[in-house]
Amino acid sequence: MVNRMGMNGEVSPDQARRIMDMLTDGGAMDNVNTPLALRLIPLAEELGDTKLVERLLTHAESSASDDVETGWVQFESLRWHNASIDEFVELAATTEKLTAGKPLSAAVLHHVGLLYLSAEKFDECRVFTTRSMRIREQINDQSGLVYSLAVLEACDKRQNLHDSALMHGTRRLEILQNLNDQEGLMESLADVAHTQATLGTFDAAIDLYTQSLELANQLEDVSGQFVARWGLADIGEIQGDYQTAMLHLSDCLHAFIAFGLPAPQPIRERLEALTKLETPSEEE
């Protein structure tokens, strides 16, 4: 993202624009190789500079040093132009045959899985994501496996296959712990907590949400705090513990205020609804 500046190194839109201009204006683009050009494309997209995206794609293609780099450019070009799924599948099949093409093939297959997930074609999503995951296992791409498992977990949840979602989510957690990926852990803990709550194992869900909240507090991630506290409030409400639910929502509201951010309206609406539920019991 380019809309914040903080300890995590994110930059403002103005800073991002200056960086892009420095790297791409005039003859500066001649010093940009294909990998760097591809990394700059998402930034150009966030800045809304479609002409620069096209320039970067053209430059990346002309600067590609081998078939694998050419394949990465083709992948980015297909994505940018909203190509058909068949075109992505064809690219994946072609690049998998290259000596160093497996990471690219896995990435393309993963993208196909995401396209099917967004179209709610869950069986197809599972097929292509699993193919991507098998390649990532072969090349020991642990970070890539995290993404594969996240898609399979989401796919299972959409189909109410919660036991399978729990299996994928647990494996994802284990890999993230080994990678010491704190932000990924925060998100994955909340995902698995949601699955546990759906299965009715509330003690496990509370423990996982609490761990996610602790990480979100350490990372000063207000979105992570919101997800964890909202989940804990859900469980409190399900168990009839409205005071605890209200406490979590109140803490969530204050967190947004502390960060100088507008609190989502559902927090206030839910607090108001819980207050109405709690008030009669206090008067009895």
Can you describe what each PLM-predicted range is?
Residues 23, 44, 60, 64, ...:
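Eukaryotic all-alpha helical interaction scaffolds
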Residues 32, 66-69, 104, 144, ...:
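Structural signature of alpha-solenoid helical repeat junctions
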Residues 48, 82-86, 120, 140, ...:
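Residue-level detector of the short coil/turn that links helix A to helix B
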Residues 14, 51, 85-89, 123, ...:
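Residue register within tetratricopeptide repeats
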Residues 42-45, 72-80, 103-118, 143-158, ...:
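Conserved alpha-helical positions within TPR/SEL1-like repeat arrays
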Residues 1-105, 271, 275-284:
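Flexible inter-repeat linkers and adjacent short helices
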Residues 40, 53, 60, 88-95, ...:
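Tetratricopeptide repeat
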